[in-house]
Amino acid sequence: MTAAILIFVTCILPGQVVLQAQDPDSRPSESKWPTHGWAKAKPSSVGLDEKALAAFDADLASGKYSLVDSFAVIRCGNSVFEKAYSHDYGTIYAKEAKMRGPLNAHLTGPYNYFDPAWHPYYHGTDLHSMQSVSKTVSSAILGIAITRDDFKAGLDTPLLTYFDVAKVKNGDDRKRRITLRHVLTMTTGLDWNEEIAYDDPKNDASLMEATDDWVQYVIDRPMAHEPGRVFNYSSGVSELLAYIFQKETGQDIEKYGEKYLFTPLGIKHYWKRTPMGVVDTEGGLFLNTTDLAKIGYLYLHDGIWDRKQIVSQDWVRQSLTPFTDAEEGFKYGFKWWLLPRTDRPGYIWMARGFGGQRLMVFPEENLVAVFTGWEILKDETPDRDLVNRLLPAVRTQTCAAAP
């Protein structure tokens, strides 16, 4: 994921990536920053193949790529394609909505994933469940707090600093060695099974959401590995971010994000909370499609928005560094998925969520793509299949019109 605004260069040390700073003159003019809405342009005017996008749109509408709710493409600061696809989820999941199970431990409310009042859209609005894209946005808010020196602890601070150790089960020396860095990179070593389907009663994420105290459920898990050695995807570990943020800063992560991220970028949102009132940083955020694109655009511009440094370039660089091998051929940074490119060195940056939520950033093409969906009982479309439909639509490496 050369005429980019932001270029992902080669690794110069194991795990370290250098980002080439963008030329300030190449950034959008103030009038084009999409705080209050994206400027519109035809795909061909920014070097995209309109027929290729139209064919992809037709396949999305046909259901070839599962239950997709929306698709948007941003290139060179312009919205060149936005489309919503309608599905009657009340009918599609009517049977499941009436049966108690791992995805609807409560027959109504925010943690029944078949309740059409809550999923995929929040109470009839255009705010769509982001699921695990929430993790990536939470990482951005943490980065802002570090940038502003409101979060003072270093990333090598032990996780148990924020807990009464006497009340933590399964304590051993390995658990004492878990740090905030391990939380960000999914390498805590905690025993956690989220590889099986979410409607499987043995899935730890579903088990956690059926409890009242999610944070306690997570921190009480036994250890399976030495911290820092094994990537193990864990929604529970990501839920700890909200708790840690409150303990370290004395502030609520949603309210902080409202002030320093959502408002400056012009993003409207809703964020679910756990039964204990903790912000659901593992999967509870709701955004609309084009507002989600703003998160990718912020990172595409080194954390700068409308000529203001919202999150430091250093945090952006670290977030997009491939610290560990992950699943499905991905690398993993600070809550960002990094898909190795097959056509050149570098990565496509992604935020990924259950049901088909995808934020994709192609830095070398100056392109951001967003998908939302609600395919929650079947396998989602592989990310490379979507990438392989998007990249052929790019006709020019610059923002020049397609020939």
Protein language model annotation of sequence segments:
Residues T2-Q16:
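Bacterial N-terminal signal peptides
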Residues D49, A54, G77, K83, ...:
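Active-site SXXK
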Residues A61-Y121, N366-V370:
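A short, well-structured edge-of-sheet supersecondary motif
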Residues K83, Y93-W118, D156-L160, D199-E226, ...:
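Short, charged, amphipathic alpha-helices and their helix-cap/turn boundaries
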Residues W118-P120, G124, S129, T147-L190, ...:
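Active-site helix/loop module of the DD-peptidase/beta-lactamase fold
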Residues S139, V237-I244, G283-I304, Q357-G373:
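Active-site-proximal alpha-helical segments within enzyme catalytic domains
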Residues K268-H269, V316-V368:
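Active-site Gly/Thr loop motif
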